[in-house]
Regions:
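Acidic, Ser/Pro/Thr-rich low-complexity regulatory regions
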Residues: 2-122
Length: 122
């Protein structure tokens, strides 16, 4: 990147950027639907109402910060955003079908390296 005259955004393919912008709202809606089902299960469970209330409040506070709920849309952050969606379980690698092979391979490599790092394997 340094010295090659290209910025990070120049390396993002236009087709990948358009696909990301079109799929992100769909992925977010599906993720929030999943969260709503989890919240309903939490509230419908056994236990004191106060415990369920405070657990729901804690979960919502954490969940609303995830990329599946809110995400800063910028071309320069697209790859990091996709990694966040993948690592948070909002989407799977299979849902990257249609993106460029180069991008999918790059994300898979980073995720594999991250898993190796988390498990102490180098």
């Amino acid at each position: 990147m340094e010295g090659d005259g290209m910025s990070a955004t120049d390396k993002i393919k236009e087709a990948d950027w358009r696909l990301f912008r079109s799929r992100l709202p769909i992925w977010q809606e599906a993720y929030m639907e999943r969260l709503n089902r989890e919240y309903i299960a939490l509230l419908s469970g056994t236990g004191p109402a106060s415990e369920k209330f405070w657990e729901l409040e804690r979960r919502m506070r954490e969940d609303k910060r995830r990329g599946g709920v809110v995400m800063r849309m910028s071309r320069s952050n697209m790859e990091l955003n996709l990694l966040s969606l993948l690592s948070d379980g909002v989407i799977s690698i299979a849902e990257l079908d249609g993106f460029s092979e180069e991008l999918r391979e790059k994300l898979a490599l980073v995720l594999r390296d991250h898993r190796d790092w988390d498990h102490g394997n180098s």
